[in-house]
């Protein structure tokens, strides 16, 4: 199970310099690491995002297990920002945790779990609409059900 604790994912801490990581972590196919580009010496670059490259059905966030049986409640409590992808998967952005979840509801999988550094917060936090607003708009506009064909008779 993936573990997110403060600003780390499975013990990989944001803000660490590239030189602090060994080749095992840098080349691990389960994680994608992104370093800043503001340093001339590449080994001085700091980690700004880390994401899981594997699909999972649950993860731990500061000791709380999040899975598909409690995801809806978690979303209602946290009211994240939301975006819908072309494939009808959902991106949830949690500014409070510097966390992005890419969710596939058809297969009940978290396709990507990403944490980001404070230095790039504005790249993530200004996108999408609030989860609560998105839910209200779904109730007002029932034609958002993309799985169903709805016929509206001409009057």
Q: Positions of the model-derived regions?
A:
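Short helix/turn-capping signatures at newly exposed starts of structured segments
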Residues: 1-155
């Amino acid at each position: 199970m993936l573990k997110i604790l403060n600003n780390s994912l499975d013990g990989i801490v944001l803000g660490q310099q590239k030189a602090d990581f060994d080749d095992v972590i840098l080349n691990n196919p389960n994680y994608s690491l992104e370093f800043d580009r503001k340093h001339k010496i590449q080994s001085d670059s700091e980690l700004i995002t880390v994401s899981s490259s594997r699909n999972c059905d649950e993860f731990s966030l500061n000791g709380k297990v999040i899975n598909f049986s409690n995801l809806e409640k978690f979303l209602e409590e946290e009211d994240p920002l939301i975006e819908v992808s072309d494939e009808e998967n959902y991106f949830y952005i949690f500014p409070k945790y510097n966390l992005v979840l890419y969710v596939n509801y058809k297969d009940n999988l978290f396709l990507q779990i990403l944490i980001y550094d404070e230095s790039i917060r504005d790249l993530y936090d200004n996108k999408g609409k609030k989860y609560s607003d998105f839910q209200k708009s779904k109730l007002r506009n029932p034609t958002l059900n993309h799985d169903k064909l709805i016929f509206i008779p001409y009057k």
